[in-house]
Swiss-Prot record:
Glycans are attached at residues 80, 95. The modification Phosphoserine is found at residue 2. Disulfide bonds join 145-177. One of its GO terms (cellular component) is extracellular space. The lineage of its organism: Eukaryota, Metazoa, Chordata, Craniata, Vertebrata. GO terms for molecular function: cytokine activity; death receptor agonist activity; identical protein binding; protease binding; transcription cis-regulatory region binding; tumor necrosis factor receptor binding. It is a single-pass type II membrane protein. This is Tumor necrosis factor. One of its GO terms (biological process) is positive regulation of protein transport. Residues 1-35 are cytoplasmic. The keyword Cell membrane applies. The gene is TNF. Belongs to the tumor necrosis factor family. The soluble form derives from the membrane form by proteolytic processing. The membrane-bound form is further proteolytically processed by SPPL2A or SPPL2B through regulated intramembrane proteolysis producing TNF intracellular domains (ICD1 and ICD2) released in the cytosol and TNF C-domain 1 and C-domain 2 secreted into the extracellular space.
Length: 233
């Protein structure tokens, strides 16, 4: 609908209104409602067209081409994934062929010596000062209980460069047997795992060891059951 047509319709409506001024009150009310409806429809149509073709509308924030909004968490994850860690870390496992003794190896699958950590004389050598998570697990296995008390110990020790004395950092003791297996009774198998872990301030050159008192009871059935490691924090 053009502007001229809209003006013409308004003039005709005014003329009709003047001619019927002396008419009934009901006729006047109908005419007013008709005019109101006409202008309402015309205005709504015009507004729809302006919005549809983008003449008016909400403002949009413009960003340079190729720029994307990334949340702080996403930025952190993305940057951390691109940064390779250079912190010392080690994970060694027991030598399965060394029956009767606990010897650590880093040549099996899923073992690791990274960023200057060394394995020397069955000890892990710390390459730099700092906080370290030290952890170790051993698994004991036996058949029946002897007449004497059976105590199993697992100890993680440190020999510091500042003082050449072995100091226990973590130590645990367990007794798998509460009483002796009666004579003639079936000797049932038992299993006793011991896991230890803690965070310690270490110095470059410190030596760490993980030892037990009764290696004959170690369970070497599966690789990875007995392990020792450190992680720089």
């Amino acid at each position: 609908m053009s502007t001229e047509s809209m003006i013409r319709d308004v003039e005709l409506a005014e003329e009709a209104l003047s001619k019927t001024a002396g008419g009934s009150q009901g006729s006047g009310r109908c005419l007013c409602l008709s005019l109101f409806s006409f202008f309402l429809v015309a205005g709504g149509t015009t507004l729809f067209c302006l919005l549809h073709f983008g003449v008016i509308g909400p403002q949009r924030e413009e960003f340079p081409t190729g720029y994307s909004i990334i949340s702080p968490l996403a930025q952190t994850l993305r940057s951390s994934s691109k940064t390779s860690s250079n912190k010392p870390v080690a994970h060694v496992v027991a030598n399965l062929s060394a029956q009767g003794q606990l010897r650590w190896l880093n040549t099996y699958a899923n073992t690791l010596l990274a960023n200057s950590v060394k394995l020397e004389d069955n000890q892990l050598v710390v390459p730099t000062d700092g906080l370290y998570l030290i952890y170790s697990q051993v698994l004991f296995r036996g058949q029946g209980c002897p007449s004497t008390h059976l105590f199993l110990t697992h100890t993680i020790s440190r020999i510091a460069v500042s003082y050449q004395t072995k100091v226990n950092l973590l130590s645990a003791i367990k007794s798998p047997c509460q009483r002796e297996t009666p004579e003639g009774a079936e000797a049932k198998p038992w299993y006793e795992p011991i896991y230890q872990g803690g965070v310690f301030q270490l110095e470059k050159g410190d030596r760490l060891s993980a030892e037990i008192n009764l290696p004959d009871y170690l369970d070497f059935a599966e690789s990875g059951q007995v392990y020792f490691g450190i992680i720089a924090l």
